[in-house]
Amino acid sequence: VEGDWKTTLYNKNYESIENKNLEYTEQEKSIIAQYSKDNPLHVLCDPTRYPYSYNENGEMKGIIPDYFRKIADYAGISYEFLTPATRDEYIAYQKNKETTDMSIDARLETDNYAETNKWGITAPFITMQLARVTRRDFDGKINVVTTVDQTASNSIEDAMAPGAEKLMCSTRQEMMEAVRKGKADAAFVYYYMAQAFVNSDTTGTMTYTLLEQPTFTYRMVISSTENHALAGILTKAMYAMPQNLVEDLAARYTTYKAAELTFVDWIRLH
C-alpha cells in the first residue's frame, strides 16, 4: 500500500531504531537549535504533482509538504518553503545550493548517488505506486498514451504502452484531461493523482487501475552545504509518526464531497 513504512533505515547512525517517540541526543538538540526562526531551513518540492505537492497562491500544499511540516514540527526545526510555480523553476532551485537547503521529494536510484553528491538522506517515507487512468469505455488497447515532456529516455509510457503514439502534455493533470476528452487512451500517473482526478470528475466517465509495479520510493535529501545529521534527526521524527499518516493526509485531497464538486466544476468551466 502506498505510504507503507520501510523498516530499513538508511541513516548509518540509527540502524537499530525500531521504537517510536525517540529522544534526541544533546548533539542533535544543538543542531536543531541552529535552525531557529532567524535561520530557517529552505525546503523544496515539485509544484506540479497535485495532490502530492503543488503551489496554491504562493503556498506549498499537498501530501508531501503536509508530511514534512509534521516531522519538522515534531523535531522543532524552523523551515521555510521555496515556492516555485513551474517545474522549470523547481529544477532551477534544485541546482542552486545557495537557496535550497533540502529537497523533500527525492527519488534516488541508488544510495551511492546521494553519497557522490555529498547529500544527507533520510529513510524512505513514501512509496508511490502507479495507476493507469482511462475512460470507462476503454477496450484494453492503448493506441495513444499521454506523457509529460521530461528527460527520461526509457519512460514509463515506453514500458507500459510499447509502440503507442505519445501525446505530449505539459502537466500530469493535462495528461488525464486529454484522456477524459478522448484525445488519448491512457495516462500513467501516481496513484493518489489518479484517485483525486477520478473522484473529482463529475462526468462519471473516468476510472483508474492501481498497478503493482513499478513502485518509486521517495526520501528527503539534505544539501551538501547543510549538516547531514539533520537527515538522522528527521528520520527519527518519521519513525515517531502514526503509521497511517501518509494515507490520512492523502484522504484530505482525494475524497470529495458534493459541495466541493461544484467548485471543481466551476474551475473546469472557466
Kindly give the residue locations of the regions a language model identified.
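Extracytoplasmic/periplasmic ligand-binding sensor domains
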Residues: 182, 186, 191, 200-201
